[in-house]
Amino acid sequence: MLAFHFTTLQKAESEYNYFIVNNLKNLRKVFNIENLKWELLEDESENQSGNIYWFNLSYDHSSGEGSYLYRMEPNTKSKAHHHTGPEEFFILEGDLTDSDGYLYKKGDFVQLSSGSSHYSTTKNGCTSVVTHRGKYIYSEE
């Protein structure tokens, strides 16, 4: 009886794996940074010389969770904001200076804990991948 049950489980697992592999194309999204239609992030771009753009990968405004691409033009400053959950970002190109003066550069992966507050500036422009696990709230600097 145990051998029959084990064989049945193996068969079910095999069928599941076959389904996943053969349906992977229906479960996959691919974005190439060279071919994106960036959107102006108006809340961040108002009242400053440089603009900030984003491309939503999976960010959900209602939960504050997910990922997006974030691009700042040279000599731009983001608005100050507070994080209700952790934020992580990976610098793909350019430079980014946090409000405490810490300079991030291409290749840096940054983790900010829940409860952090900051704004960022860039001298040469910056493109990053950002992931939030909680909402961010604009604040006074």
Annotate each predicted stretch with a short phrase.
Residues 98-117:
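Short acidic-glycine-tyrosine-enriched beta hairpin
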Residues 74, 83-99:
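Glycine- and acidic-residue-biased ligand/ion/polar-headgroup-sensing regions
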Residues 31-37, 133-141:
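Long, charge-rich low-complexity segments
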Residues 53-83, 114:
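Conserved short histidine dyad/triad with adjacent acidic residue
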Residues 114-138:
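Ligand-binding loop in jelly-roll beta-barrel domains
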Residues 2-63:
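A short, N-terminal "cap"/entry segment at the start of jelly-roll beta-barrel domains
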